[in-house]
Amino acid sequence: MKKTILLSVVASTMMMAGGNVMPVVVEPVVAEEKVDMGEVFGQFRTFYIDRSYSGIVNNNRNSLAMGGYIGYKTPTFNGFSAVIAAYGTYGFDIHDEDADILGTASYDPSLYGDAFDNYAFIGQAYINYAFGNTNIKVGRQRLDTPLAGADDARMLPNLFEAAVVSNTDIQDTTLILAHVTKESVGTFGNVYGAPSALSLQSGYGLGYKEGTSGEFADMGVIALGEGTNTDGVTAGAVIYKGIEGLNLQAWDYYAHDILNAIYLQADYKLSTVKLSAQYINESDVGDALAGSVDSNYWAVKAGTSFGGLSGYAAYSQTADSDNASMNGGILTPWGGMPAFTQGMVTRHMFFSDTDAWKVAGSYKFSDLGIKASVYYVEFDVGQSNTYKPGQAWTASESGFDIQYDVAAVKGLNLRFRANFPRDFAPGLDWDEYRVIANYNF
């Protein structure tokens, strides 16, 4: 009876409402569109270095610094984006005398600016435009190319003012065209003390001091010193990866009124074996501000790997050339250091009439996030070298490098490395240790 009454009430209600029951409409929940606010990126670095000299010099020096960079990348709009990044380093006073006392022997200069400066500056500021397979980047930026590069071996890297165009329209091929006008020299350059033939053949020109402490100086001035302003360096490259296991690259650097440098490299990997070769040729151009340049270097490398274990051996040779700049040694004023046979600090393989060989091995403990490496390199330096003219000697360097990626802290890398040059110059030895913490975000 109760059911009958209830059905009657429902039926009456439906009739009064016109007999149609309208379903309840549930409005869909619309997720708020995420607004692209751009990206903050950077690296915080803490660096401790300790070097003890022996032989013709007896001294211990060490430094502790903190710094790095922080930057912002805008959202992309119609292919355009922009980046700005500030760089800086601050060295701590860990000795009784201050680091800014020029000529102090207690502090290592490679973590500071010129004259042990603490400094900060805008190191990157560029506009990027991407369309199709082409990318254009104009402004202050980091470069990592064979003969002009960041050389990020201490607190702050080399940075450049440049326009760079890259294109991948051709299958398996990357084309690069760049024009570089200025460089700001990173803190590593200060390890050379004063510009010299040593610095010029080790990545830092005769005018590198003009570009320290965050200053950007003309590429010609960086290479050869004051009064050698030029139109910069124009570079082009072709990188080809169309054959399985084979990677070919060819670079040409036209340093206006100084030199033209050609860099070639081939890498071939077959199963666990990798074979590589490289070649550098330099010749003077235009007003020949560096004098007659006639330099040639070549090197080969063979490596193999098995599981987490890998190793390689390399050999290089730089020819001599009478009456040429650096007697035929390779001029590398803009941080480029691609040599297979370089040490952690010793870069004598680019000296005139010098043969070098190197062996190295590493092991990855993948489960622990640890990679450990060891190496030994030897340089047979000829008498025509311009670092110690008229002297022939054998220099060597051994060392190790241990890196630990901390799993509990994303982006944190801890590093302990050391180098032990013997007869860097005849009778000059040292032991150097570095402890580095990098936090990338």
Regions found by a protein language model. Give the residues of each.
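Extracellular loop and loop/strand-boundary signature of outer-membrane beta-barrel proteins
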Residues: S54-N58, S110-G113, A148-D151, V221-L224, ...
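Short sequence motifs at beta-strands and strand-loop junctions characteristic
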Residues: N60-L64, D114-F121, M155-P157, T228-T230, ...
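Positively charged n-region of N-terminal signal peptides that target proteins for export
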Residues: M1-T4
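Flexible, solvent-exposed coil segments and beta strand-coil junctions
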Residues: F47-I49, T104-S106, R140-T145, G214-A217, ...
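Outer-membrane beta-barrel proteins
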Residues: F47-R61, A65, L147-P157, E282, ...
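Flexible internal linker/loop segments at domain or repeat junctions
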Residues: S325-F351
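Beta-barrel outer-membrane channel/assembly domains of diderm bacteria
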Residues: S8, S12-L143, A163-D169, T173, ...
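Signature for the C-terminal beta-barrel architecture of outer-membrane proteins
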Residues: G132-I136, R154-L331, Y376, D380-G382, ...
